[in-house]
Amino acid sequence: MMTMQNFRVRSIKEDDINEWFRLRKLLWDESSDAEHKAEMLDIYEHTDSQLVLFAETEDGKLVGFLEASIRPFVEDCHSDHVGYLEGWFVEPDYRQYGIGRKLVRSAEIWARNKGCEEMASDSEIGNDLSFKAHLNLGYEETSRLVHLRKDLV
């Protein structure tokens, strides 16, 4: 049986790229491979304002990840330097062991060390699992937003 002690949270290493790609595709399956690779390159080149963390089991398997950033503006926040949870994911077989919580707490410490006084995130309307996970970690709903578009051609 897995326990909270059977994994560790660590920063990205160069040889994590393939596993990072695999985990990203599980979280954001609507993005193309090219979009993932472009975003990953951008994140990897801006480690001053971007963070990637992994949850690694004792046997070296990456079972979760988190991406965070520092944003100059976030809706409904009071400061202009905000830590932002871009996304986090834990493989289904490894959920309910505190892995997501530890990933998020590690990102919050990183943001605090970067001078942030607030941490923010988002969750798509209808993604109840994500919304409840945020609430369980102490985040509060500030607003709901639906994006709209129209072709002008």
How does the language model describe each region?
Residues 101, 113, 125-143:
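Conserved active-site alpha-helix within GNAT-family acetyltransferase domains
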Residues 7-20:
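A short beta-loop-alpha structural element at the N-terminal edge
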Residues 54, 61-70, 84, 89:
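Conserved beta-strand in the GNAT
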Residues 90, 96-109, 136:
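Conserved acetyl-CoA-binding loop-helix of GNAT-fold acetyltransferases
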Residues 31-54:
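Active-site rim helix/loop that mediates acceptor-substrate recognition in acyltransferases
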